[in-house]
């Protein structure tokens, strides 16, 4: 909403523009009226809308045309004043003033106009019969007011309507010609309805209506008031109320009624509470709240954010199969202006046999977005109405900023839940297969993935000492010389080589020696395609001898050419190394250590899924 309002009064000489301003300020008719009143500012605390208001007078005798044009450009609303007892001044409204104003303003952003019939004390009849056709002809005219500066009739109302025309304009909401709401308004209110429909049954029940009422107006509706609202809808349409709740059609009808009855402020209050600006676009302040991330820190969703996202999933998982079908996913994202997840997401997270994103995959994708692009995560949470449903100041309340990694190293412990593993290796060595295996896909399933749907990320959960952690794998394109800082910034590194290709290991050795030999980032050598015949590597040292020389863990055998889903043990090891980068190689080689780290991983995974299924049944 605007921080102030600038009102300009124009019209023919002697129609009473200056008298109107002076009567408002002094609350009495002036004995002497100057040719033009100085600009006055009404403080916010004495205006109904609590917004500072500047009132500007125009005098043809004292100002040039250029000065008039400048004032028209600066004005938020223009009052065209005519005298109800002067037919010529009424004619000038359409023959001179409206065309002049429209010439000086953009067609797509017309300044709202108020027609003001002054000197109503001098006539017994109304000018409305003459004015109404003009109002119907020009959609930029918000309203018409008849008043009298002499007896103070409708003076304060005039300036209130002028304020209202700026702060709660009709133009973006409603088409007088069509007598219906504009598409952009319907779209915004439909999103608001879907967010407020907490159980996604297409109806706002009494609890949801009361939550909506408290959210927008800070007061609940009494039971009788709720019934009165629904009765108004019932009397005007057959499908506005269903199962004693308000349907989308009924919700839209109510707002149409508010607008038609001059209660624009009601609809605008709702729109602004849900983040919309005067052009019915979500504001940048709403979508992207101020959020700073110190160096060497990462971003994660907190517990309340996960609970919210779980409720969104549950709301749209209609068949309760713990996965989102394409239709369910499309329905979930109807509150977005675009589809945020492409087909690559299905190859980034866990899916079921039908290729649908599972409950775990859904949470994983949100975790990935938060980690890699927190601003986009804030935007997405804004579309879902996080701050409104969770009653928070902004989406920033959903994000936890982890402490500096150097502090974690010093203290030899971390509170982080998301760890990044960059996967490097020569072209064709099996990096993509390594990522997809983490999602439970063997070689047969991987061959079904289209090249244009490929993802360079994979994220899922692992369990270390009974704690659920997210491991984010990122496949880095092969380029020894020009690896970027982003390619090197991670918690653990996987150097993958193809044991059947004699030239594959050389790339891993070069990357390690150039970029990681002197770093504190843990590294693991992965001997991929271990189901194939092992070829001797064309390098001065064998992979095993290379690892011994550089005090690395021996090469880890890996294959995704299995009948069942590939084992996740290796990924648990990677997560553990990322969590405990200070551990010595002797510790990491200790089989008892790995046993303790991975114990219960399968049990915890199964238990977590079973608990979610049980919760669904309870609901």
UniProtKB/Swiss-Prot annotation:
Main location: mitochondrion
SMART domains (alphabetical): EFh, RAB, RAS, RHO
Domain EF-hand intervals: 184-219, 304-339
Pfam families: EF_assoc_1, EF_assoc_2, Ras
EC number, UniProt record: 3.6.5.-
Binding positions (GTP 2): 427, 429-433, 447, 529, 531, 559-560
Bilayer disposition of the protein: Single-pass type IV membrane protein
Reactions it catalyzes: GTP + H2O = GDP + phosphate + H(+); ATP + H2O = ADP + phosphate + H(+); UTP + H2O = UDP + phosphate + H(+)
Recorded GO MF terms: calcium ion binding; GTP binding; GTPase activity
Cytoplasmic side: 1-593
Topology, Mitochondrial intermembrane side: 617-619
Gene Ontology cellular-component terms listed: mitochondrial outer membrane; mitochondrion
Protein name stated in the entry: Mitochondrial Rho GTPase 1-A
Organism: Danio rerio (Zebrafish)
